């Protein structure tokens, strides 16, 4: 008998995780990456590494998925909502400054739809007040700000690999950073705060030994998922190029439409175009939305301002109002945008929306 192994294949934790982390880190230009179970856990880990806790405030946008604010609550902190720029729909640095108090510890900047935020202005404010900057790049893998990819700009950046994102691992997420301390904290956090690293442990009783140093979570991603992620990364630039082609056709089709407002693109940025969000004017948004769904078109709305959700209304946010975010929310519809969308399908979307909006 030659011996018995406990497991023949590294299905849960294996070499593809490190390979995927290195691939994404190299792509965006970051030193370190931590692959994790999903985009929400990535935000949670980033807030944990930033030291967010009770009494701390974190400024973020209301025009986002709830996870961008919930991650602050998970750590015991308080989300504070700054209004958005009416053109880009991203967080407005001027309102960030207005919302800063002596309890502010960090800013979470969300690159809505893949359009990068005004990071120079945000970094200037963060430097002035000694704040940590976390970028929620769930929509923005491949997006570029002034010649640099999102993921190389701030203290930490999170990504999501949900099925509708630029690439997918089924479910999955990642945090990238140049800060070794943040990296080590997040690597522990995703696996119960446990390590087998001799350089960190206070003692070692044998090959079986491990120690827990933080109250972490089981946020591990599997080797199988990361193998898919490695394959997807080889296709990312092709996916992004196709998204840009679709966006260009939408922009051209709606260029002369008074009742359809197309996304604003900053001249010194490149959006990853996760979403194509239009505003419909002089017509009933709900009627347009429901009619398009009835015609088999998968439209959506991104997003309901976070503080308008019942949970937030019942927990101290009932008097919060961000005028720009609420005005934008009342008019927006997200049109289908994915690499497999055909020109014929897109023409059907365009013609249907124009007809419903009186164009």
Q: Where do the protein language model's features map onto the residues?
A:
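Structural detector of well-ordered beta-strand residues that form the stable sheet scaffold
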Residues: 34, 59, 80, 133-134, ...
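Short, small-residue-biased leader/transition segments that mark boundaries at the very start
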Residues: 1-9
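Conserved active-site segment immediately N-terminal to the catalytic lysine
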Residues: 135-168, 184, 208-213
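PLP-dependent aminotransferase class I/II
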Residues: 15-23, 27-31, 94, 106-110, ...
């Amino acid at each position: 008998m030659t011996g018995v192994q406990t497991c023949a294949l590294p299905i849960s934790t294996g070499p593809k995780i490190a390979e995927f982390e290195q691939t994404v880190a190299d792509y965006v230009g970051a030193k370190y990456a931590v692959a994790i179970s999903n985009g929400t856990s990535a935000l949670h880990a980033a807030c944990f590494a930033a030291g967010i806790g009770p009494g701390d405030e974190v400024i973020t946008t209301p025009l986002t998925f709830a996870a961008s604010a919930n991650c602050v609550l998970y750590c015991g902190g308080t989300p504070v909502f700054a209004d958005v720029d009416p053109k880009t729909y991203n967080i407005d640095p001027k309102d960030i400054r207005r919302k800063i108090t002596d309890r502010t510890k960090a800013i979470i900047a969300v690159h809505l739809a893949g359009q990068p935020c005004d990071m120079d202005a945000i970094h200037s404010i963060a430097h002035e007040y000694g704040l940590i900057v976390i970028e929620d790049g769930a929509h923005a893998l491949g997006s570029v700000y002034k010649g640099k990819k999102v993921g190389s700009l701030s203290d930490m950046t999170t990504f999501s690999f949900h099925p509708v994102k630029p690439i997918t691992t089924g479910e999955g997420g990642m945090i990238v950073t140049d800060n070794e301390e943040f990296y080590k904290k997040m690597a522990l956090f995703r696996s119960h705060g446990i390590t087998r690293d001799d350089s960190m442990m206070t003692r070692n009783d044998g090959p079986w030994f491990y120690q827990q140093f933080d109250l972490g979570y089981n946020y591990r991603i599997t080797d199988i998922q990361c193998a898919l992620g490695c394959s997807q990364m080889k296709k990312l630039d092709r996916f992004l190029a196709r998204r840009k082609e679709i966006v260009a056709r939408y922009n051209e089709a709606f260029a002369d439409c008074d009742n359809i407002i197309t996304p604003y693109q900053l001249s010194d940025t490149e959006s990853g175009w996760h979403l194509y969000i239009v505003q419909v004017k002089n017509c009933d948004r709900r009627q347009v939305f429901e009619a398009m769904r009835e015609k088999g078109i998968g439209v959506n709305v991104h997003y309901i301002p976070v503080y308008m959700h019942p949970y937030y209304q019942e927990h101290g946010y009932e008097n919060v109002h961000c005028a720009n975010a609420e005005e934008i929310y009342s008019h927006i519809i997200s049109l289908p945008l994915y690499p497999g969308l055909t020109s014929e399908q897109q023409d059907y979307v365009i013609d249907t929306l124009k007809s419903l909006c009186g164009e």
